[in-house]
Amino acid sequence: NTIPLQECAEKGIVVFNTPGGNANAVKELFLFGISMAGRDILGAMKWVYEYDGSEGPIAKRMEKIKKQFAGPEYAGKTIGVVGTGNVGSLVANIALNLGMKVYAYDPYLSVDAAWKVSRRVFRVATLDDLLKHVDYLSLHCPLTDETRGMIGEKQIAMMKNGARVINYARGEVVDEDAMIAALESGKIARFVSDFPTEKMVKAPNAVLTPHLGGTTGEAEANCAKMAAVQMDDYLKNGNIRNSVNFPDVTLERAGSARICLIHRNIPGMLTNIMPVFSRDGINIENMTNKSSGEFA
């Protein structure tokens, strides 16, 4: 979220990302997250490290106080997964293997992503349909104008009392003030997020990590390889794959020369461009044009 995408597009700079490169790393972090969302493991760990021995040996004292950190098992519970792309599809499938009933919501589901999700996952048509069913909610959607603040006061009110929310999407997908209020009231039993803020660290029952989703050696290597392949294809062939500010566009290499043009997505642009080639006696053997928003 730190790159000025619009400014880059205005200057013809293609910005790539590497979707799926860290998907397994985030899936594995989800296993930590759902465990922390259930029992108060964080509180229990704090107790262990802060215990000063004033009430006797730790081995005896812990047996008397451990029930205060108890929580539910996730086997047999219902989880809702919002976003079933590279990460969400893995999370949905592993939740099934944990013995959970899984609902999924993704209005932008691609055909490729659909094949990755088990048939045992229940798909719902709206977010509201998902929220009313779940004991756990796991977020794995991109941050867009539509998803910003997607989980707010209204959506939280639809959920079961004592539901648990895991956010490995983007921090802004959740309305922070609404979530803090829900934690304070007990409406949400626990909130696990990889996106800490100064306000959220003070909230009760919030378990926060410093954006650890892709922090494995394997994930970093995967992303680096994907980025190198995508950049090489763009520089050599003009193909754009996995850009966040331009549409995906690919064309098999046929001739010895290739021209990649970035232009405004307005009527008449191609009509103005084509005569330049005709004037210089250049034949266009094949071409493709894709647009997205203001640019093509």
Give the residues covered by each predicted segment:
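Rossmann-like adenosine-cofactor binding region
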Residues: 107-200, 215
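Phosphate-binding beta-alpha-beta segment of Rossmann-like dinucleotide-binding domains, i.e.
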Residues: 19-78, 242
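Oxidoreductase and adenylate-handling cofactor-binding alpha/beta cores
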Residues: 27-46, 93-100, 225-239, 274-275, ...
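N-terminal Rossmann-fold NAD(P) dinucleotide-binding loop
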Residues: 88-89
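Short beta->alpha connector loops at strand-helix junctions that form conserved
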Residues: 12-24, 169, 211-213
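Glycine-rich Rossmann-fold phosphate-binding loop(s) that bind the pyrophosphate
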Residues: 82-85
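An N-terminal-biased, well-structured beta-alpha scaffold segment characteristic
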Residues: 1-18, 132, 152-154, 158, ...
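NAD(P)-dependent dehydrogenase/reductase Rossmann-like domain
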Residues: 191, 201-204, 212-296
